[in-house]
Amino acid sequence: MSNNNSKLEFVPNIQLKEDLGAFSYKVQLSPVEKGMAHILGNSIRRVLLSSLSGASIIKVNIANVLHEYSTLEDVKEDVVEIVSNLKKVAIKLDTGIDRLDLELSVNKSGVVSAGDFKTTQGVEIINKDQPIATLTNQRAFSLTATVSVGRNVGILSAIPTELERVGDIAVDADFNPIKRVAFEVFDNGDSETLEVFVKTNGTIEPLAAVTKALEYFCEQISVFVSLRVPSNGKTGDVLIDSNIDPILLKPIDDLELTVRSSNCLRAENIKYLGDLVQYSESQLMKIPNLGKKSLNEIKQILIDNNLSLGVQIDNFRELVEGK
């Protein structure tokens, strides 16, 4: 299968091999170049467990509760337990929705579950039977949960500036929709087959998850495509094309931007700082959902990196992506 030029001589295929139930699946990638399946499997596994984005509750405001150490009459769980239960609610948002408030209001006794949330179009609660609280006697119980799209497990993801109302409680959000990943490699003689076991929380399809992991990994290594050996032919450090300032190759995803700002830029296909600096203020303000607050945040990020808007860079994307 391999030749001296190390070129692939086959058309690879990715498919769902088996649905194991309980949001567990086997995804098959084949054929894979001999010796590459373990490398590919490890890369997919690490990206799936660390870098996919998803929706999660980031803060909650419970009626008649001032802080997380409060207790409620006729409620079995304390507030800490209620917040912990809210963290486990699996929420699926349609593309274009990156933040919203969910309301829950009941007057009953018994278990209050995720299915009691009032949802709107574009919002789906996957695990409707997830318990939130247990009411030992009939009583009113209501809360407002703020849901946001993010990446990675964020420690108290609702930063202090977002705790605007009295009684707002931050939730240690778990954005990653992937719960477990394993892989197995099968030798086919002149090629290999990679099988990836993926367990999700139900908010993402397995093929989409693996594909997104591959896309994200490719984005991260694409900045090295333009690396070249020095023209003097000496071994040692590999240099980036001298026409590009290395700071301009920094991915937007690596900046400390809010979810809204990051999503707006991503929707505009702004991948690197080098893409961003070529925009003017007026051009950025025309991007849907990007307001003055996001603009000021972006300008501060550029200042922190000794950059500014309105810079012209000829053929930047072509140089970066080797086109």
Swiss-Prot record:
Reaction equation(s) it catalyzes: RNA(n) + a ribonucleoside 5'-triphosphate = RNA(n+1) + diphosphate
Main enzyme class: transferase
Pfam families: RNA_pol_A_bac, RNA_pol_A_CTD, RNA_pol_L
Region described as Alpha N-terminal domain (alpha-NTD): spans on this chain: 1-228
Region (Alpha C-terminal domain (alpha-CTD)) location: 244-323
GO molecular function: DNA binding; DNA-directed RNA polymerase activity; protein dimerization activity
InterPro entries (alphabetical): DNA-dir_RNA_pol_insert, DNA-dir_RNA_pol_RpoA/D/Rpb3, DNA-dir_RpoA, RBP11-like, RNAP_asu_C, RNApol_insert_sf
GO biological-process terms attached to the record: DNA-templated transcription
Subunit structure: Homodimer. The RNAP catalytic core consists of 2 alpha, 1 beta, 1 beta' and 1 omega subunit. When a sigma factor is associated with the core the holoenzyme is formed, which can initiate transcription.
Domain remarks: The N-terminal domain is essential for RNAP assembly and basal transcription, whereas the C-terminal domain is involved in interaction with transcriptional regulators and with upstream promoter elements.
Family the entry assigns: Belongs to the RNA polymerase alpha chain family.
Name of the protein: DNA-directed RNA polymerase subunit alpha 1
